[in-house]
């Protein structure tokens, strides 16, 4: 409960929990301007797939326009000093979330990409400035992003999302 309640109060990366009050109060935000700058660094084919499926950046999913009409992507997370804790963003929504979770052709949403880019980007560039990501639990869903499953290239989803950020997963 010590972690579930505060994460839920911040929206828990779930539209059902991200009430207008939670969205407006959330301090962790990625401006549309910063997100577009990050998005512009993606491999062209990967970026085009995201736009085709989710629309132009910053999208509408988890976007708050109460402070900035251009939009800010809200990241439901808890930050304490040099540690940040968040629920992994969803890959998508629909009637069959398990199929969406494991869909190797579904590109990540703008919100999904923004969360990882915020984690990895330097603080002076609007990010958290992490040195690594640690996934806890059964497994994450990065490995299900479009692209190869071994010998990843910059055009593969997991590499495009994480960039140079090391990922420590459950062994």
How would you describe each model-predicted region?
Residues 1-21, 84-88, 95-123, 127-133, ...:
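Catalytic or ion-translocation cores adjacent to nucleophile or general acid/base/metal-coordination motifs
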Residues 1-85:
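Extended, H/D-rich, highly charged conserved domains that either
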